[in-house]
């Protein structure tokens, strides 16, 4: 019997005799508590919704295949990259960041770009965005970002004042804000945007030699974006425009592809790098650290059930494989805790047993975690009645020392170091990015900024103009004109008392 032909039962298999008429005392009487199907149906319904992600709540996803096209074994011994032509099953989830599950896809926002590779050495999660940088470089600010871009506690509305007050309080945010206000702030859809690992990671080879790397994913469909006006028209008729585009393209066999590249920096180069190479608000220039092709991935299968695969997909940067490692990037270090902890809250401690999260490349039957019990431990028989402690006489839970990573370079005493004393080069890179734009693209940055700052107080607008001017005088003048503010009325050389310097006092 096919699934389409199956007759209705309860969750424990009991046949349901009537799904349309409740059991009552007489034809018009009150309901009886012994109507077990009604009770079951409603109690299940009352619990259908799980907590949504605090960020990246609105998402779309698909399964696919990653294929190695170039040899990078001199940098890493990760088996996923071991030979040209090697293929690995994967899952990708794209998302907006600030909006809730019902948010419109065509909003001006960062896009999440999360990849899960089911390798033979375990799952590798690369949790990135469609931008190479972020708003700040210390994870202690992450909760504040969440609050600033989400709903105001009094009005329960998204508030541009909160948003821009926070962004302009952090001069290092200008790089990301410039990208967000540019044409790339609203991708046409998910297929026509690049992706970035954003953070600095590391690779090591069989000799234990470590290099620092950044991951890039360039769309093979080309870059296409939306103006504010076109995006507004799309949102008015289709709030799921990007999700619809991805799903329908895959359904008709028009499979999207991205090419994976890495940038490589040696440990010696990192020591001599002009800026902190682990600063998430900055990029590595391509002329100094060129893109090196690695492979490509193709998304070729839609999930059969959105909730099972997309909503329950759990990504965490702690899911990393031999041959790959972390870096001193403070934001990455913060996410090593936050992501897994959020998934355990949202999905439960055993969320790794959900099919989309299982280590398919290893096989669930071949893993041997030390964890036991917990809510919904169902897949691996809870390791049965065997030995559940270590050390023991059977060799169970023995370590695998052949997978030890090379020593991780660190230096200095533990202390709350002032990041602004270490690096205050906030404006060089956003200035270079601005100057790369065509004249028309610059004008759109000015207009988009003015649109986004509607309703924001003048003091915050002036703060943003000052930062833009420090990046490039033309940038500051253009934003000032779009906002209707006389740039000559602004002290362009100094910060006022409402800046980040005051926040730290």
From Swiss-Prot:
<feature type="binding site" description="axial binding residue">
    <location>
        <position position="339"/>
    </location>
    <ligand>
        <name>heme</name>
    </ligand>
</feature>
<dbReference type="Pfam" id="PF06628">
    <property type="entry name" value="Catalase-rel"/>
</dbReference>
<dbReference type="InterPro" id="IPR024708">
    <property type="entry name" value="Catalase_AS"/>
</dbReference>
<keyword id="KW-0376">Hydrogen peroxide</keyword>
<comment type="similarity">
    <text>Belongs to the catalase family.</text>
</comment>
<comment type="function">
    <text>Decomposes hydrogen peroxide into water and oxygen; serves to protect cells from the toxic effects of hydrogen peroxide.</text>
</comment>
<comment type="subunit">
    <text>Homodimer.</text>
</comment>
<dbReference type="GO" id="GO:0046872">
    <property type="term" value="F:metal ion binding"/>
</dbReference>
<dbReference type="InterPro" id="IPR002226">
    <property type="entry name" value="Catalase_haem_BS"/>
</dbReference>
<dbReference type="InterPro" id="IPR010582">
    <property type="entry name" value="Catalase_immune_responsive"/>
</dbReference>
<dbReference type="GO" id="GO:0042744">
    <property type="term" value="P:hydrogen peroxide catabolic process"/>
</dbReference>
<feature type="active site">
    <location>
        <position position="129"/>
    </location>
</feature>
<keyword id="KW-0408">Iron</keyword>
<keyword id="KW-0575">Peroxidase</keyword>
<dbReference type="InterPro" id="IPR020835">
    <property type="entry name" value="Catalase_sf"/>
</dbReference>
<dbReference type="GO" id="GO:0004096">
    <property type="term" value="F:catalase activity"/>
</dbReference>
<dbReference type="InterPro" id="IPR011614">
    <property type="entry name" value="Catalase_core"/>
</dbReference>
<keyword id="KW-0560">Oxidoreductase</keyword>
<dbReference type="InterPro" id="IPR024711">
    <property type="entry name" value="Catalase_clade1/3"/>
</dbReference>
<keyword id="KW-0349">Heme</keyword>
<protein>
    <recommendedName>
        <fullName>Catalase</fullName>
        <ecNumber>1.11.1.6</ecNumber>
    </recommendedName>
</protein>
<dbReference type="InterPro" id="IPR040333">
    <property type="entry name" value="Catalase_3"/>
</dbReference>
<feature type="active site">
    <location>
        <position position="56"/>
    </location>
</feature>
<dbReference type="GO" id="GO:0042542">
    <property type="term" value="P:response to hydrogen peroxide"/>
</dbReference>
<dbReference type="GO" id="GO:0005737">
    <property type="term" value="C:cytoplasm"/>
</dbReference>
<feature type="region of interest" description="Disordered">
    <location>
        <begin position="1"/>
        <end position="25"/>
    </location>
</feature>
<dbReference type="InterPro" id="IPR018028">
    <property type="entry name" value="Catalase"/>
</dbReference>
<dbReference type="Pfam" id="PF00199">
    <property type="entry name" value="Catalase"/>
</dbReference>
<keyword id="KW-0479">Metal-binding</keyword>
<dbReference type="GO" id="GO:0020037">
    <property type="term" value="F:heme binding"/>
</dbReference>
